[in-house]
Amino acid sequence: MKTCIITYTNEKFVSKIQTMISEIREIGKYDGDIVVIIGEDLKDRLQYEDDDRVIIKYFPEIDREENIAKLKEKPITEGWGNPEFNKTFMWHKLYAFHPFFKQWDKCFAMDGGMKIFKPLEKILNLDCKNSILAHYDGYPNNTDWKLRRQFDDTQFPEIFAELEGEFDLDVDYFQATMFIYDTSLLRDDTFDTIIELSKKYFTSKLTDQGIVNLYFNNKKYYNVWEQIQIKDDETYYYDYTERDGLNYTEYIMLKRAHTCPHWSF
């Protein structure tokens, strides 16, 4: 089975990506393909000459000027740092579902800056046939969190009303910080449909996360999200951060490793 790891970076986070790739190779013991998705700011500039299995893949910026102007006029996430217009590169993460990736059977996507503490083999070997594996965002203590909280319902009530009429928003939802999916799920129109959703429902508070759930975690398109394995007898697999007094050494990988002395955001 052909597998690739996908990650993303703009110019600001290049050094974090380089560190993460080193950890994937040296600690994660993964020697397969790694695709780094980039945009305009790194086009024809970022190279990885020391590793011929690191593929730098440029994708063009998607025009969001009209949506961004509306969001600047009526911000939707002031308590969260306004990623809707301050972190617009996050929309580039949607390219993880581009037809380009059909050349692999399984794709393991992760945010730049992820910390790797153990070999990735156990995660890479998880069975994702006909599914997307990812971690529930409300784990473990916020089991009342449903998909509706990922979308603004105040500043743009008319958009929320349309969204609520089209999708079931009272479902659990997954983090888009990391996921593994079977590329047979990629239809000819998958990427275009996801982009259309992202423009129509631009009031997704954490940009890509809500949109990916609309497509892969709802009856209208696909209802194929499965909770990724949390742990086995030897280790925890992945979480956003350490939980319940656990130490980073008890995980394969973390997004934010607060107990790790070498971690910085």
Predicted regions and their residues:
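Glycosyltransferase catalytic domains, chiefly GT-A lineage
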Residues: 1-265
